Structures are given as C-alpha cells and as structure tokens.
Amino acid sequence: MKTETGNKINIRFIILICIISKIMNAQTLQTVPSVDLKKYAGKWHEIASFPMRFQKGCHCTTAEYTLSEKGYVIVENRCNRNSVNGKQSYIKGRAFVVPNSGNAKLKVQFFWPFRADYWIIDLASDYSYAVVSAPNKKYLWILSRTSTMNETIYQEIVSRLKEKGFEVSKLQKTIQSKV
C-alpha cells in the first residue's frame, strides 16, 4: 500500500515538474529591449527557418514591412514555389505592436480573427539581421537585409539560439536567388 501511494506521489511530482518546466521555458524567452520600427521597416530575406506547413516548397522568401498611417505595420510575404523561378506566392497582413514591449513584440494577422506572436529576439545594431520567434519557440526565422548572410554571423546567431533553448537542428536554410 505504501509503495502504491509512493508511486502516485512520484508520478504527480514528475508531472508537476514537467508542467513547471514547460511554463518556465515559455516565460524565459526574451525579446530585444526595443525596436525602431522606422529602421525595421523595409525588405527582409529569410536566411533560415523552422519548417512550416504554409512555407513548404518556398524559395527566395522575403518579408516587407511598411508603417501604416493608422499605426499598424503592413506585412507582405512573398516566396517562389518549388524553385527560385517558380510561381510567386503572396500574402498580405497586418502587425500590431504589443503595448509596453518596446516595439519588440507584435501580433501578426493574416486572417481575421487569428493573430500570431511575432517576437524580435535578436537584432543587429545596424538592423542588418533580425531573428523572430514566438514565446513557445515553435516558430523561428533568421532574416537579413540581403539574400545571403556571412557564415560566421549565421553561426554566431545559431549559437545564441541554442543557448536560448531552441532546437537549432530543426533550422533549414532558405534557398535564395543571387539577384
């Protein structure tokens, strides 16, 4: 009887530890302190990302951000399907800054009423690259102002992501044209 009770307590304790670990993991992801949206606006090239169903077969993936007069950010994502010369896929949405986030946390909306987290977790001081994720770490994009990135810089970013608890082995480099 004592063994059965002890096992129940151990199982409950293990479950509790797993739940706390999951909660703490979500809470520990930090964004950059602040983002100047005027500097952030413009065209970004996807250098690498975690595989996403909606991006399957995408090459030459870009995102363009434009500040609207109404206070939100216009988001335009493009990619060429199945090859660098494939048919272009396009989607337009809006991003809304989360209050008191230093502009580093946004909610992106492509289809009403759904919004997704867009957290800027790493950003070059000259805005030459950015890393975007969500608090659950299921999404990850490494972005650059150019279609290629210096391999040393890329590896430094990947190293920082590993320190933050990301499964960097899931990262896939995006095929970009040299145009």
Language-model features: where?
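Bacterial N-terminal signal peptides that target proteins for export
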Residues: 3-13
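A beta-rich soluble binding module of mature secreted/lumenal proteins
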Residues: 22-179
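Bacterial N-terminal signal peptides
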Residues: 12-22
